[in-house]
Structure formats: structure tokens, C-alpha cells
Regions:
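Long, hydrophobic N-terminal alpha-helical segment
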Residues: 2-45
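Amphipathic protein-protein interaction modules
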Residues: 62-124
Length: 145
């Protein structure tokens, strides 16, 4: 299996098809112009190097979450972002329900919901859900929910 690599993430071993995952993310062309999404994209350009390396090691484009929700906090100066990304992979060792990982304030979990899987993705698919509180960087005010 060319391009498939074993990756150790704490006590879990994942078998990831990096080229296939990257190819799927390259094909995703959607763009969302809601200001909450635009702020997420802006903040991602200044992400912690550990977070960026985590996504790069999985073959995921951090700017293209499969699903993204957001809630203003701290009087509109911060946003709680939750969502998911998908990758062409499977768990080789470790329990699905025990996979919780915190990297630079980002909480990641493997989930079984498999919501909003990119159409181009097939085969073994893992969903990584996340939650993070990020600053509001745009010069626009946060829309009321």
C-alpha cells in the first residue's frame, strides 16, 4: 500500500493513507463566506506549530473542516469552534472511545458519527472531532446567534 503510513498518537496506532487523504482535501473546493468561518480561516493561519504539524501528519487541510459550528463567548472577543475532519485511515491499536487528545488548547476525539464526510472520500474513514476556543480576529463584529 503505497503512501500508507503507521502513525503513533499517544497509545493509539493509526494506519493512514496520507496521499489519498491529501488528494481528497485538494479536491474540496467549497468556500463559506459566513464571518464565523472567515474568522476560523484567519485564526488558522496563525495556529500553533504543534497543531499545524498534527494536521499535516494526518494529511488534513486545516482550512477545510467537514463540519464547523461556532458560539461567541467572553463578550464577543472569543469563539468556541467545534467541528470535524475526516481522513482515510483505520485504528490498528487502541480503543475508539478512549481517544482524547489535547494539543495547544485544541481538544480532539475520534468519533463514530461520521457526519458530513466529503463525497470524494471512500474506504476506511476516521472522523476527528474538535473543540477549541479561539480569538475573534476580524474587524467585523460577531453576528448575534
Amino acid at each position: 500500500m503505497v503512501g500508507v503510513k503507521k502513525l503513533q498518537v499517544e497509545e493509539w496506532t493509526l494506519l493512514i493513507d496520507i496521499p489519498k487523504t491529501k488528494d481528497v482535501y485538494e479536491k474540496i473546493k467549497y468556500r463559506n463566506d459566513m464571518v464565523e468561518w472567515l474568522n476560523y480561516m484567519e485564526v488558522c493561519s496563525f495556529q500553533d506549530p504543534q497543531v499545524l504539524a498534527f494536521f499535516e501528519n494526518l494529511g488534513i487541510d486545516i482550512l477545510k473542516p467537514s463540519q464547523l459550528s461556532y458560539y461567541p463567548v467572553e463578550e464577543g472577543t472569543m469563539m468556541i469552534y467545534t467541528g470535524s475532519y475526516h481522513l482515510c485511515a483505520e485504528i490498528v491499536e487502541g480503543q475508539m472511545d478512549g481517544w482524547d487528545l489535547v494539543i495547544a488548547g485544541h481538544c480532539f476525539s475520534l468519533t463514530q458519527e461520521h457526519n458530513a464526510i466529503p463525497q470524494e472520500m471512500s474506504g476506511n474513514i476516521l472522523e476527528i472531532s474538535f473543540e477549541v476556543v479561539l480569538p475573534w480576529l476580524l474587524d467585523l463584529s460577531i453576528p448575534a446567534k
